[in-house]
């Protein structure tokens, strides 16, 4: 008896499958994917984006994270810590790997189906063997591979965009946490100042040297300072805990986290428009992502035009029939074709849906392209405005307030003003410093947003109006 594999029909089937396999199938290499993501987001990850797949790799990550926590964590170190330590970051990388693998799977040919049957009819015994595979799937394999490649590329771009979003969140959260810590220190000074004023007013009233109205004003300042201190304390906790969550720190690691006492100094000069435009021209992820979505839709539309009409399956068959009555044996063989007939459904709605999806992707690409320049202009304007405001506080407002404080100190020493005037001026000076801290915070938030905008992932930054300086309303005696 001849083997089924020697039947010409089977040879043809196996030849077609072999050709399809040799033609190449879509595949995903995790290391190459991460290398590409690091190349696209080098200014954000410094090439340290990596997925731990073994216990040894996880231990190495934890050791590196622990080493970073032994010193004060700056903004750059915070990003490194998130890349090394955050389970959410690792989950994002693993999910991207899964999405790319599923995209690659869609570009591969389905496995053939082998069927075996045994039938007895009287004295006849028949064994049937059928090898079936999707003929249309085989014919359209190059198209499906092209779609899979586009989906893999789309997944890689999406990964880069998510990495930029995540690192930008870490940068901005670090800025808020440090600014909140710095503001809390000055809020404590205001509170201590107001507390001293309220206590002095109470004692002066007790000996008849202060009226009730003046004492009530000092007590009001003290109560307001206590409220502001509580709010600043809660704001510092919230900002720090937000950063802890983004870094993926556990309780022990959170206890080790040390942040700087103040924000970094402003750069000597703001970035110039020409420099920003040059950096932005190197490629925007939002446009790349929209373009890849259009490419996927366009290729899928061409394939759906064929698949929506019909489906074809080819089966190669070889049977063995034993006739016990005559003692003979026969080996009928042949093939069968399964064809789905488009009688009730011609696939018009599926084709319309694909056409609409492609049209939507094309218009989305146009919308993203048109909005790109607007987002960049807005981000740069916010950056430059925040820089100018912060520099104005540093170079003008704070020095002027210090000069006023120095002059009032001299006047107090000469007994030209009382202690309450001096305390009120001290409160105003601290309030000015806190406004300067807020201005620096706005700048560094805008700086992080601008860096994200250069690659097409703006987060949006609003510049808060500076609060008007409030005098302590000093009362003499």
Label every model-predicted segment.
Residues 93, 146-149, 212-221, 419-427:
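Short, charged, amphipathic alpha-helical segments
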């Amino acid at each position: 008896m001849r083997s089924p594999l020697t039947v010409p029909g089977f040879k043809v089937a196996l030849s077609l499958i072999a050709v399809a396999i040799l033609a190449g199938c879509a595949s995903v290499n995790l290391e190459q994917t991460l290398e590409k993501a690091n190349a696209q987001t080098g200014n954000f990850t410094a090439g340290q984006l990596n997925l731990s797949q073994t216990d040894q790799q996880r231990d190495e990550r934890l050791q590196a994270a622990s080493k970073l926590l032994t010193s004060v964590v700056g903004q750059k170190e915070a990003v490194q810590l998130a890349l090394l330590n955050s389970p959410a970051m690792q989950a994002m990388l693993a999910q991207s790997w899964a999405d790319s693998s599923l995209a690659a799977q869609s570009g591969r040919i389905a496995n053939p189906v082998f069927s075996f049957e045994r039938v007895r009819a009287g004295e006849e015994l028949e064994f049937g063997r059928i090898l079936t595979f999707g003929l249309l799937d085989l014919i359209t394999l190059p198209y499906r591979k092209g779609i899979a490649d586009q989906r893999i590329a789309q997944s890689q771009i999406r990964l880069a965009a998510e990495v930029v979003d995540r690192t930008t969140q870490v940068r901005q959260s670090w800025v808020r946490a440090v600014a909140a810590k710095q503001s809390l220190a000055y809020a404590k000074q205001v509170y201590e100042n107001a507390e001293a004023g309220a206590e002095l007013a109470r004692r002066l009233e007790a000996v008849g040297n202060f009226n009730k109205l003046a004492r009530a004003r000092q007590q009001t300042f003290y109560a307001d300072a206590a409220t502001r201190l509580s709010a600043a304390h809660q704001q510092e906790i919230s900002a720090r805990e937000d950063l802890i969550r983004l870094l993926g720190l556990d309780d022990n690691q959170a206890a080790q986290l040390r942040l700087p006492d103040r924000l970094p100094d402003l750069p000597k000069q703001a970035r110039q428009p020409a420099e920003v435009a040059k950096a932005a021209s190197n490629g925007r992820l939002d446009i790349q992502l929209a373009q890849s979505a259009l490419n996927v839709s366009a290729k899928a539309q061409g394939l759906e035009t064929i698949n929506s009409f019909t489906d074809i399956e080819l089966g190669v068959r070889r049977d063995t029939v034993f006739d016990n009555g005559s003692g003979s044996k026969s080996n009928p063989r042949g093939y069968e074709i399964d064809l789905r007939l488009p009688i009730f459904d011609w696939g018009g709605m599926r084709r319309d849906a694909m056409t609409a999806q492609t049209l939507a992707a094309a218009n989305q690409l146009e919308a993203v392209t048109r909005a790109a320049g607007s987002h960049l202009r807005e981000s740069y304007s916010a950056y430059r405005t925040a820089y100018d405001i912060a520099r104005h506080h540093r170079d003008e407002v704070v020095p002027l307030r210090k000069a006023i404080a120095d002059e009032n100190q001299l006047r107090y020493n000469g007994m030209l003003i009382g202690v309450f005037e001096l305390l009120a001026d001290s409160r105003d000076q601290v309030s000015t410093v806190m406004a300067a801290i807020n201005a620096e915070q706005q700048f560094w938030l805008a700086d992080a947003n601008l860096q994200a905008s250069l690659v097409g992932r703006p987060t949006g930054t609003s510049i808060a109006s500076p609060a008007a300086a409030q005098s302590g309303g000093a009362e003499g005696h």
